[in-house]
């Protein structure tokens, strides 16, 4: 899809036009112009009940007096002063669905005239593009019959005042980069585990170096990790025939070459059967999504390189598999982590933290400004927060606040969970420094508390995306979250 911003007189538009109308007969500014241009055509439709302005109604008009447009899409938006971000998203989705059914190739949109509380035209345009791209998304790589690309809308033009052109163009630039990052994160996550193994994940990371000359990629195999004493990470991989691989993606574009990097660490379990503590068979296929943390870090790094933000950022994709085998690690094993701390394994299905603890220790060598890990870590987080908010745990209040601000800006929502010393009590072991689980209560928090033991040398935040990384049912598939949140965080950091 090609997006642009122009300022064209309504009477001169000869393609397709999208106009907003509201309940109680209220019209957007350009809808008023259209009504005057067409000698009250829209007013008459409202009077006879053809146009209600209710959200969800889209009326298609053709052959309108004094108007060159092929079609006019009259979009009902509900109460003018009560439109929420969620409703705005639904309005965009319904509009795009209707347009695609007409096979229109170009539209000129005035929906950016919709006013939302505390949002400006930059946000309206950016959010619209991200919504449109998400609506277009198809993952048909492994289907014998592909989606018919001829049905896809080709050009989407935002009609904005001349003085707002630069603002609109920046919004388009940001939105397209983020939307591509989300798409690639979804593509990797939706890939089946017989294709997307740790080696495939590493190959995807290496492809980023071809996308941008600002990126360098190093891949560590099991031999290199063993030399670094990453025995906790390696234990998880023991039951798999596929070698564990950790990809380190370095993006350097800060004016000060010595500026400390921001580090993003993504959990990359390309399949998690639970190991010896085997998961139930029901929905086990969804455990290909246990690498969504790594996929989202990949997506963020792609968006970052596309935007060429003036930052130093390092993305780590911690890839491996957790499978049952005669060589698998066992409940009762005691592992020595890269940090030197020992961990008693009480459940092999609490493996993500065993991988991440070594990855979090590894990134100390970069002397980071801050570190954020992203992981589908706990079912307990899904129980606590459902599928709308990612769980946020942080040792640094300012970092947590910045992430929550980015979540609010993008509607890629997160909710901060507590992290106090009491939770460490649940991780005590009679035989090692730590246990890898903390019992029944507060599982999302105790998982974060476990990781906190390996992050004492830098500001750290943890995003548990177990509830937000993918959808089930008829809409089954990866969401690409939290690419939007993290990219916005980096945009804010670059200012």
UniProtKB/Swiss-Prot annotation:
Mn(2+) 2 binds at residues 267, 272, 290, 351. Its cofactor is Mn(2+). Gene3D superfamilies: Leucine Aminopeptidase, subunit E, domain 1, Zn peptidases. The active site is at residues 279, 353. It is an enzyme of class 3 (hydrolase). Mn(2+) 1 binds at residues 272, 349, 351. PROSITE patterns: CYTOSOL_AP. It comes from the Bacteria. One of its GO terms (molecular function) is manganese ion binding. InterPro entries: Leucine_aapep/pepB, Macro_dom-like, Peptidase_M17_C, Peptidase_M17_leu_NH2_pept, Peptidase_M17_N. It catalyses: Release of an N-terminal amino acid, Xaa-|-Yaa-, in which Xaa is preferably Leu, but may be other amino acids including Pro although not Arg or Lys, and Yaa may be Pro. Amino acid amides and methyl esters are also readily hydrolyzed, but rates on arylamides are exceedingly low; Release of an N-terminal amino acid, preferentially leucine, but not glutamic or aspartic acids. Keywords: Aminopeptidase, Cytoplasm, Hydrolase, Manganese, Metal-binding, Protease. Presumably involved in the processing and regular turnover of intracellular proteins. Catalyzes the removal of unsubstituted N-terminal amino acids from various peptides. Belongs to the peptidase M17 family. This is Probable cytosol aminopeptidase. It comes from Histophilus somni (strain 2336).
């Amino acid at each position: 899809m090609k997006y642009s911003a122009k300022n064209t007189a309504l009477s001169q538009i000869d393609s397709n036009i999208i106009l907003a109308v509201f309940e109680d007969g209220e019209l957007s500014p350009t809808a008023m112009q259209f009504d005057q241009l067409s000698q009250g055509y829209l007013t008459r439709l409202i009077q006879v009940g053809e146009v209600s302005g209710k959200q969800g109604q889209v009326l298609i008009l053709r052959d309108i007096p004094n108007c060159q447009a092929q079609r006019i899409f009259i979009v009902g938006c509900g109460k003018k002063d009560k439109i929420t971000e969620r409703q705005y998203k639904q309005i965009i989705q319904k509009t795009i669905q209707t347009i695609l059914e007409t096979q229109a190739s170009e539209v000129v949109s005035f929906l950016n005239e919709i006013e939302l509380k505390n949002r400006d035209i930059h946000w309206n345009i950016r959010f619209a593009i991200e919504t449109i791209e998400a609506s277009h998304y198809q993952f048909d790589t492994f289907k014998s019959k592909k989606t018919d690309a001829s049905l896809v809308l080709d050009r989407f033009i935002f009609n904005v005042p001349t003085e707002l052109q630069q603002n609109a163009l920046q919004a388009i630039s940001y939105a397209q980069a983020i939307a591509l990052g989300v798409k690639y994160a979804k593509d990797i996550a939706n890939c089946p585990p017989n294709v997307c193994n740790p080696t495939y994940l590493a190959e995807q990371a290496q492809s980023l170096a071809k996308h941008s000359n600002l990126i360098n990629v190093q891949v560590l195999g099991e031999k290199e990790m063993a030399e670094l004493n990453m025995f906790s990470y390696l234990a998880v991989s023991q039951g798999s025939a596929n070698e564990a691989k950790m990809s380190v993606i370095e993006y350097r574009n800060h004016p000060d070459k010595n500026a400390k990097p921001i580090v993003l660490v993504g959990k990359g379990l390309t399949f998690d059967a639970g190991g010896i503590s085997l998961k139930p068979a029901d929905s086990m296929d969804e455990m290909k999504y246990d690498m969504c943390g790594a996929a989202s870090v990949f997506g963020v790094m792609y968006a970052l390189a596309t935007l060429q933000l003036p930052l130093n950022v390092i993305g780590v994709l911690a890839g491996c598999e957790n499978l049952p085998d005669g060589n698998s690690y066992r409940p009762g094993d005691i592992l020595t982590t890269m940090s030197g701390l020992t961990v008693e394994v009480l459940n092999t299905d609490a493996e993500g933290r065993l991988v991440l603890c070594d990855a979090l220790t590894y990134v100390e060598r970069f002397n980071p400004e801050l570190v954020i890990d992203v992981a589908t870590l706990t079912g307990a987080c899904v129980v606590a927060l459902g599928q709308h908010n990612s769980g946020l745990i942080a040792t640094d209040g300012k970092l947590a606040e910045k992430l929550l601000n980015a979540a609010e800006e993008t509607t890629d929502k997160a909710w901060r969970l507590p992290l106090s010393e009491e939770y460490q009590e649940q991780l005590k072991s009679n035989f090692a420094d730590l246990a890898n689980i903390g019992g029944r209560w507060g599982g999302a928090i105790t998982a974060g508390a476990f990781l906190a033991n390996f992050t004492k040398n830098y500001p750290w935040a943890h995003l548990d995306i177990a509830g937000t990384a993918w959808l089930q049912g008829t809409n089954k598939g990866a969401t690409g979250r939290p690419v939007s949140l993290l990219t916005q965080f980096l945009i804010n950091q670059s200012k």
